[in-house]
Every structure is written in structure tokens, then in C-alpha cells.
């Protein structure tokens, strides 16, 4: 009985679809075809314009360069080059980067330049306990990122913004979170040297990590890694949500 009812429903559905297809040419007068085509083309153009507007608007909000360019700095410390970013904590603004970017260089010789060519005046330096992170105090209110306090999700879209290859230009690298730990996350965004200190942003434009290091995991002796992402280059970003900061002398 149930089988017959299902069969009748399928036949009824096919009949109605056929009837609609048969009636559509009759329902639309021939004289209206040209007007309909013109209207359709105009609508297509408007939809294209609207799509471009939405793309531009959302790129400012989804962790992209447009909404972040006034918060990024190119860092040069001796022979080292990397990335820094401004983030607000409470009422204070700090410039964050990796400790290895400025290692062995006096704070007075660290140069952090915003993309509008403003050189930041760096104040007191603090180092993260047990992590490759430092931050410098900044004076005055400045455009700044906010920290994402929630634990990120695997599969979440992220953007890495920074001084890729240390060539003095900021690039935008997109990818996803593919691993989450208490102190770091793993991403598939292909950042490289020079991106050390780059903010890793979620779609809301908040900081979920600091691009910090790559690990070459190629191991031909371990057959279990063959044809997996664990037998290649892996990329990690340090989380900031539970860092303990210590003053530097």
C-alpha cells in the first residue's frame, strides 16, 4: 500500500512539472519576450554590481587586508625582518611580534613602520613566559585589533597578514585552522619566513594567533606518514588567550 502511494506521488509530481512546462510558453505573450530579455539583462547587471558591493563590504569585515592595513607594521631589527601588529588590551595598545624577530637587538634599534610610513615609538618591552612572543607598549590611542577569547574551531577560515619573505610588503594569505591546542593552532595558510609575528585573523577580524614557525616533517623512514599532511611542512601560530607576560630589563 505504501509503495503504491509513493508511486502515485511520483507520477503526480511528474505530471505537474510537465503541465507547467507546457503552459509556460502560453502564459508569456510573444510581445513580452524582448521586454523580458531586456529586464533580465538589466537585473543581471544590477546583481553583479550588488555582488561586488557585498564583496567589498565583507572583505573589510572578514579578516582581510582592507580592514587591517592601519594596524600592521613591518619590523626590521638588525639583519632580521618580520611582522608586527597592534592589539588593544584593556585601555592599552601593544605592538606584538615573535621574540626571534628581535632577538639580540636592543629595543632602541628595533624599527616598526606602519604602512602609511609612520615609525612607531616603542615603549617598554615584555616577553611571554615560555613562548616565542614579545610585545612593546605604545603611546596614545591607535587603531588596533581585538583578541578572540573563544577557542577557535577546526575548519575555521583564517587570514595571515604580514611581511612575507621579509621583502617589506604586506601580503594576504588565506587558509583554514587544521589543528587546535592550548597554546597554539595549526593552519594550512602557506605563510613563509618574514611572516613571523603576523596576526592570524578569523572572519570577524579578531586575532586567533601569531604566525610563529614552520616544521618540516618529511620523513621517508616513517611509512605511516606517507601521503598525509604529516609528511610535509606544517605551520603553527601561537595563541595569546592565556599568555603570562614578564617585563624585560
Q: What does each model-found stretch correspond to?
A:
Residues 1-12:
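N-terminal secretory signal peptides that target proteins for export/translocation
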Residues 18-27:
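Bacterial N-terminal signal peptides
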Residues 34-63, 207-249:
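C-terminal cap/linker of serine protease catalytic domains
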Residues 142-195, 211-224:
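Flexible, gly/ser-rich surface segments that form the specificity/activation loops bordering the active-site cleft
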Amino acid at each position: 500500500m505504501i509503495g503504491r502511494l509513493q508511486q502515485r506521488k511520483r507520477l503526480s509530481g511528474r505530471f505537474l512539472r510537465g503541465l507547467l512546462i507546457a503552459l509556460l510558453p502560453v502564459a508569456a505573450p510573444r510581445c513580452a519576450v524582448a521586454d523580458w530579455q531586456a529586464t533580465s539583462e538589466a537585473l543581471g547587471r544590477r546583481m553583479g554590481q550588488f555582488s561586488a558591493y557585498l564583496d567589498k563590504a565583507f572583505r573589510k569585515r572578514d579578516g582581510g587586508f582592507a580592514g587591517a592595513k592601519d594596524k600592521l607594521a613591518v619590523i626590521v631589527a638588525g639583519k632580521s625582518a618580520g611582522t608586527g601588529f597592534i592589539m588593544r588590551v584593556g585601555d592599552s595598545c601593544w605592538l606584538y611580534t615573535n621574540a626571534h624577530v628581535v632577538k639580540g637587538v636592543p629595543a632602541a634599534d628595533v624599527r616598526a613602520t606602519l604602512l602609511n610610513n609612520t615609525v612607531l615609538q616603542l615603549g617598554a618591552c615584555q616577553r611571554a613566559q615560555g613562548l616565542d612572543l614579545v610585545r612593546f607598549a605604545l603611546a596614545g590611542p591607535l587603531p588596533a585589533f581585538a583578541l578572540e577569547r573563544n577557542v577557535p574551531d577546526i575548519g575555521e577560515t583564517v587570514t595571515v597578514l604580514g611581511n612575507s619573505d621579509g621583502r617589506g610588503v604586506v601580503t594576504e594569505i588565506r587558509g583554514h585552522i587544521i589543528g587546535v591546542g592550548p597554546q597554539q593552532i595549526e593552519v594550512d595558510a602557506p605563510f613563509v619566513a618574514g611572516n613571523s609575528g603576523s596576526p592570524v585573523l578569523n572572519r570577524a577580524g579578531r586575532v586567533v594567533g601569531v604566525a610563529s614557525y614552520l616544521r618540516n616533517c618529511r620523513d621517508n623512514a616513517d611509512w605511516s606518514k606517507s601521503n598525509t599532511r604529516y609528511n610535509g611542512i606544517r605551520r603553527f601560530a601561537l595563541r595569546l588567550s592565556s599568555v603570562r607576560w614578564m617585563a624585560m630589563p
